[in-house]
Curated annotation (Swiss-Prot):
GO cellular component, one term: mitochondrion
Record keyword Repeat present: yes
N6-succinyllysine, modified sites: K165
Source species taxonomy: Eukaryota, Metazoa, Chordata, Craniata, Vertebrata
Pfam families, alphabetized: RMD1-3 (PF21033)
Compartments where found: Cytoplasm; Cytoplasm, Cytoskeleton, Spindle; Cytoplasm, Cytoskeleton, Spindle pole
InterPro entries referenced in this protein's UniProt entry, alphabetically: RMD1-3_a_helical_rpt, TPR-like_helical_dom_sf
Entry protein name: Regulator of microtubule dynamics protein 1
Annotated family: Belongs to the RMDN family.
Subunit and partners: Interacts with microtubules.
Residue spans of the TPR repeats: 168-204, 222-258
Single Gene Ontology MF annotation: microtubule binding
Transmembrane regions: none
Keywords, in A-Z order: Cytoplasm, Cytoskeleton, Microtubule, Repeat, TPR repeat
Provenance organism: Pongo abelii (Sumatran orangutan)
Length: 314
């Protein structure tokens, strides 16, 4: 009704007035005085019937535009609601360890423009690539596919900490297929995106953990890789075990026991720093961590082997 009331103002006459009253008002004075006024009016409006139809069409166009806006807004709301529903399903499948079902769900929306959906698809592609039953050929395809999804997520939303995190992870994975030079060349880019992810969300333990892995990797870099790094950079990437340790501890402070690998790497870093007591403490925690994924099982095995080796040497 409010819309109808607004439209009524555009019509050439109102209720209670005769259709010709707009023109007849000009005849109330002397004919010689009003004639020119009426002529000027006709020169502007043209034929009265045409003018009325024009105004009516304008009013209908206005009504059509408002209807279009309402429908468009409703479509956006519906699309947003659908994306939210997909994300809820995806997060449930991820938490349940349903790796392949999650990938199948999200690949249906691989042309999406939504950054939240795209980085989840990058993660799902990578997770399927890491399954033991995935062939080497399929794994390579999935790794590159994951990088493309992560890149698109970042392009859609540079303020998404998760997009930065998964772009860095996927870029690192691609280095496994492009050689040590490419891996080292991408090192600073990877670090930059991990640091940006932490800046955007200081409470994300995974981003902090990954920054720790970056430090650990360059702290233990073998001599021949250091030579390659010096050829690629004036100041090659480097780090220390102490820096790695600080990130692993920081991740635990943010979210205790969030990830079995963080526990394992705390133990391994303490071994590198020759602190056997604390190394044993964290390796034991890694060994006793409940195994929910294949990776958890592998970490349990590695922690147990390190503890056995550790005890035999003592």
């Amino acid at each position: 009704m409010a819309l109808a009331a607004r439209l009524w103002r555009f019509l050439p006459f109102r209720r209670g007035a005769a259709p010709g009253s707009l023109l007849s008002a000009g005849t109330s004075g002397s004919r010689g005085h009003c004639g020119p006024c009426r002529l000027r009016g006709f020169e502007v409006m043209g034929n009265p019937g045409t003018f009325k139809r024009g105004l009516l069409l304008s009013a209908l166009s206005y009504l059509g535009f408002e209807t279009y806006q309402v429908i468009s807004q409703a479509a956006v709301v519906h699309a947003t609601a659908k994306v939210e529903e997909i994300l809820e399903q995806a997060d449930y499948l991820c938490e349940s360890g349903e790796t392949e079902k999650l990938y199948q769900l999200l690949t249906q929306y691989k042309e999406s423009e939504d950054a939240e959906l795209l980085w989840r698809l990058a993660r799902a592609s990578r997770d399927v690539a890491q399954l033991s039953r995935t062939s080497e050929e399929e794994k390579k395809l999935l790794v590159y596919e994951a990088l493309e999804y992560a890149k698109r997520a970042l392009e859609k939303n540079e303020s998404s900490f998760a997009a930065h995190k998964w772009y860095a992870i996927c870029l690192s994975d691609v280095g496994d297929y492009e050689g040590i030079k490419a891996k080292i060349a991408n090192a600073y880019i990877i670090k930059e995106h991990f640091e940006k992810a932490i800046e955007l969300n200081p409470k994300d333990a995974t981003s902090i953990h990954l920054m720790g892995i970056w430090c650990y990797t360059f702290a233990e870099m073998p001599w021949y890789q250091r030579r390659i790094a010096k050829m690629l950079f004036a100041t090659p990437p480097s780090s220390t075990y102490e820096k790695a340790l600080s990130y692993f501890h920081r991740a635990e402070q943010v979210d205790p026991n969030f990830y079995s690998k963080n526990l394992l790497l705390l133990g391994k870093t303490y071994l590198k720093l020759h602190n056997k007591k604390l190394a044993a403490f964290w390796l034991m925690k890694a060994k006793d961590y409940p195994a929910h994924t294949e990776e958890d099982k592998q970490i349990q095995t590695e922690a147990a082997q390190l503890l056995t080796s550790f005890s035999e040497k003592n």
